[in-house]
Amino acid sequence: MSFNPELATKTLEAEGLRCPEPVMMVRKTIRTMQDGEVLLVKADDPSTTRDIPSFCRFMDHQLIAAQTDELPYQYLIKKGL
């Protein structure tokens, strides 16, 4: 699937933040969302390329798409499976 930020119902700007802040903010934001909603995360911390996919697996959310070829990194996360 190609990366389509228009799928997002919410956006989280995490640029300039360093581990573990981006993932903590993703967790806090997703808690306020309904199942099926999609979060667009923008970050520039290289650790997010590892941490966000792991977070999604561990917390049973779906990483719909990731763009990690250039900054800012962008992730589309669907709440729930």
From Swiss-Prot:
One of its GO terms (molecular function) is sulfur carrier activity. It comes from the Bacteria. One of its GO terms (cellular component) is cytoplasm. Pfam families: TusA (PF01206). The active site is at C19 (cysteine persulfide intermediate). InterPro entries: Sulphur_carrier_TusA, TusA-like, TusA-like_sf. CDD domains: SirA. It is found in: Cytoplasm. GO terms for biological process: tRNA wobble position uridine thiolation. Sulfur carrier protein which probably makes part of a sulfur-relay system. Belongs to the sulfur carrier protein TusA family. This is Sulfur carrier protein TusA. It comes from Vibrio vulnificus (strain YJ016). The gene is tusA.
